[in-house]
Amino acid sequence: MRHLHHQTSQTKLWAVIPAAGSGSRFSKTELKQYQYIQDATVIEHTVKRLSQLPLTGYVLAIGKQDTFASTLSFQDKHKAHFCNGGVERVHSVLNALNYLSQIADEDDWVLVHDAARPCVTFECLNTLVKNAIETNQSAILAIPVRDTLKQVNQEQQIDKTVSRELLWQAQTPQIAKIGILKKAIETALKNNLTITDEASALESIGESVLVVMGRSDNIKITYPDDLELARLILQSQN
């Protein structure tokens, strides 16, 4: 596999990790990104994976009261930047992009990745960035929907079966040029659109977004049980 180092010599690559969320489905009192898997927190594992790419730097958007993140042993910590997160994930990402726009070029590429996805592989990261740069368009990791999907009514009865033929399940990282993504999110927020990921903001301004095949083991830790699954995945990948 061709690696990125020669391709990105002209193009700087940054990462944004929104990590201000409370993750209410995980726990009312604990933050999932700060749970431990083996001897490191989830977010340290996540940064370690992203740091396999030739990043110029990465920005962690954290809660205003968060004093813990800066004490962690992040990979390439000299490349770490911190900014305040926002109310929702989308606001955290925008805050990080505003921070980045002071130190980066608007044509630099930025990967936005969930803090709670520590199992993304280098192969997936490499393929995603390579595809974005070679086609000069935004891109996301995603996997085709495998299961049969049912649309139900309010009584929890099946209305119909939804064709899954063209349906993909979005993952992260999602990559775009800093200036384009910043404009997309600002425009979407101004128009009161619901933004669930970076791609939905990009779609809303007519920006084409490429889907790059991900892996089913790139799980997002959402519930307490997922920690053990992530541990097993990391163990098997190593």
Curated annotation (Swiss-Prot):
GO terms for molecular function: 2-C-methyl-D-erythritol 4-phosphate cytidylyltransferase activity. The record marks R164, K220 as: Positions MEP for the nucleophilic attack. The keyword Ribonucleoprotein does not apply. It catalyses: 2-C-methyl-D-erythritol 4-phosphate + CTP + H(+) = 4-CDP-2-C-methyl-D-erythritol + diphosphate. Pfam families: IspD (PF01128). The record marks R25, K32 as: Transition state stabilizer. GO terms for biological process: isopentenyl diphosphate biosynthetic process, methylerythritol 4-phosphate pathway. Keywords: Isoprene biosynthesis, Nucleotidyltransferase, Transferase. HAMAP family: IspD (MF_00108). Catalyzes the formation of 4-diphosphocytidyl-2-C-methyl-D-erythritol from CTP and 2-C-methyl-D-erythritol 4-phosphate (MEP). NCBIfam families: ispD. This is 2-C-methyl-D-erythritol 4-phosphate cytidylyltransferase. It comes from Acinetobacter baumannii (strain ACICU).
